[in-house]
């Protein structure tokens, strides 16, 4: 059992002002594996005060000092690799291989990217006799999701530390263990007191007072659209800066000159990875009518090879949904797809055979999907693919952009000119050509209802800065 009932505030592990705790469930076993403090407004107030006091000195640290701090974090993060991997598999249900290859590694990559971005980042610019200065924004509230416990947390922390902005972090109460390990890392390497504060709890007890606190100058949130909207409302009371990374319903356009096996394998991965609990999942697969039959045959073959099961067993590729609530949501969407007339091609409602314990869902494919159906318009956040056919490229692009979201898009094929045309036409913050992957120094964020602002690398650093003009500085 992992019992983390203390908060990390002002460089110390302290008792929570609340006597309540939150149980953490292993989604693969449905068993309680630990608990964390259920913080409240008093905890938030104490943490914000510590961060505000730390800001007075941390904002004036040099770039080299902040780089040195990030470098220490990188090295200690690497030392804690096994602890991080084990924690994520326990709390998220991610297969061990995925926890190591993706979750652990992505967290590390963001600290490295922020450290390296500072090599060439210009915080000052001379314009004649005047000076433009970029300064740390100040106390920043970070609220992170359960689906990527290290990635989403590390990218925000790394950017804030790179600028000299102290933070108060509220991780998801469903996957809080990785954040506790990060706190232990920061404590060991000597992150200055008050620069990092961890307050565990739920949205009502911690998220709301953090978003409303008058000394918090910036809120960075990753999660659902409705919650992001509420954070904006609360932040608007004192005009806080807000950075939001929200949902998606990303299109994956398959071109007619594609290698069919390669395309089927790629689109399968984009749907089942992390059990489909990915905001950038390419769940709307757009296929030319002329290759539909061949593509579907290969797609079924690829899905049949996906192994769902115990995340601690070798060979497991897909673990459980994070919770019963999430499992039920996925089941509701699958049933909705059937009700609205989509054809169930693979998978369907219920659990995979032999997996009655745990929140396991069946990887599912719908075909003959109309883009106006619920399963094509709403974020399911599970391993459910909607295959939509198109007749020509203009129609494919129109379907791809017919969504309220714009977080990511994908295209796969051979003709470079066509690939470039599609990539430039998709209305999304990130587009991948032929499974190129996203490097941590590239900006990440969404169009439309997928968010505000950008994260990752130097663009992520920009979010934690204010710009000051000093006229006559060089006179």
From Swiss-Prot:
Reactions that this protein is recorded to catalyse: an aldehyde + NAD(+) + H2O = a carboxylate + NADH + 2 H(+)
Residue positions of the active site: 245 (proton acceptor), 279 (nucleophile)
Organism placement in taxonomy: Bacteria, Bacillati, Bacillota, Bacilli, Bacillales
Family: Belongs to the aldehyde dehydrogenase family.
Main EC class the enzyme belongs to: oxidoreductase
Organism name: Staphylococcus aureus (strain bovine RF122 / ET3-1)
Pfam families reported for this sequence: Aldedh
Entry protein name: Putative aldehyde dehydrogenase
E.C. number(s) listed in UniProt: 1.2.1.3
Molecular functions (GO terms): aldehyde dehydrogenase (NAD+) activity
Biological processes, Gene Ontology terms: aldehyde metabolic process
Residue sites binding NAD(+) per the record: 146-147, 223-224, 246, 379
Keywords: NAD, Oxidoreductase
